[in-house]
């Protein structure tokens, strides 16, 4: 069973994910249909970032996954050399 702290952290992460999803959905799907002079446009970044930010996040994710896999493989290789 999860502790109270775990539940609060989990709820916070879910809430943050929902906020980001709602913001990104409004930014990418709804904003192009709203007049460019409308006041709501000042709350969103330029549209070029709608592609650049997820692309950069994807690259960073792949980089960290690759580094982690490399680290684990090298560590396991060193452990097997020590036991032999």
UniProtKB/Swiss-Prot annotation:
Question: What subcellular locations does the record give?
Answer: Endoplasmic reticulum membrane
InterPro entries for this protein: DPM2
Biological-process GO terms, alphabetical: dolichol phosphate mannose biosynthetic process; GPI anchor biosynthetic process; protein glycosylation
Provide the disulphide bond pattern.
none
An example of a Pfam family matching this protein is: DPM2
Which residue windows are transmembrane per the record? 11-31, 49-69
Pathway membership? Protein modification; protein glycosylation
One GO cellular component assignment for this chain's record is: dolichol-phosphate-mannose synthase complex
Q: Name one GO molecular function term.
A: enzyme regulator activity
Q: Which terms are listed as keywords in the entry?
A: Endoplasmic reticulum, Membrane, Transmembrane, Transmembrane helix
Q: What is its main location?
A: endoplasmic reticulum
* Membrane topology qualifier: Multi-pass membrane protein
The entry assigns this protein to a family as follows: Belongs to the DPM2 family.
Provide the assembly information.
Answer: Component of the dolichol-phosphate mannose (DPM) synthase complex composed of DPM1, DPM2 and DPM3; in the complex interacts directly with DPM3. Component of the glycosylphosphatidylinositol-N-acetylglucosaminyltransferase (GPI-GnT) complex composed at least by PIGA, PIGC, PIGH, PIGP, PIGQ, PIGY and DPM2. Interacts with PIGA, PIGC and PIGQ.
Q: What does this protein do?
A: Regulates the biosynthesis of dolichol phosphate-mannose. Regulatory subunit of the dolichol-phosphate mannose (DPM) synthase complex; essential for the ER localization and stable expression of DPM1. Part of the glycosylphosphatidylinositol-N-acetylglucosaminyltransferase (GPI-GnT) complex that catalyzes the transfer of N-acetylglucosamine from UDP-N-acetylglucosamine to phosphatidylinositol and participates in the first step of GPI biosynthesis. May act by regulating the GPI-GNT complex.
What PANTHER family does the annotation carry? DOLICHOL PHOSPHATE-MANNOSE BIOSYNTHESIS REGULATORY PROTEIN (PTHR15039:SF11)
Please report the name of this protein according to its UniProt entry: Dolichol phosphate-mannose biosynthesis regulatory protein
Top-level taxonomy: Eukaryota, Metazoa, Chordata, Craniata, Vertebrata
Q: What gene name is listed for this protein?
A: DPM2
């Amino acid at each position: 069973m999860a502790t109270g702290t775990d539940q609060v952290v989990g709820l916070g992460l879910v809430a943050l994910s929902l906020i980001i999803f709602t913001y990104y959905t409004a930014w990418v799907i709804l904003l192009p249909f709203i007049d460019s002079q409308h006041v709501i446009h000042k709350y969103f970044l330029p549209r070029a970032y709608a592609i650049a930010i997820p692309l950069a996040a994807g690259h960073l994710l792949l980089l960290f996954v690759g580094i982690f896999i490399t680290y684990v493989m090298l560590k396991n290789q060193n452990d097997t050399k020590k036991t032999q």
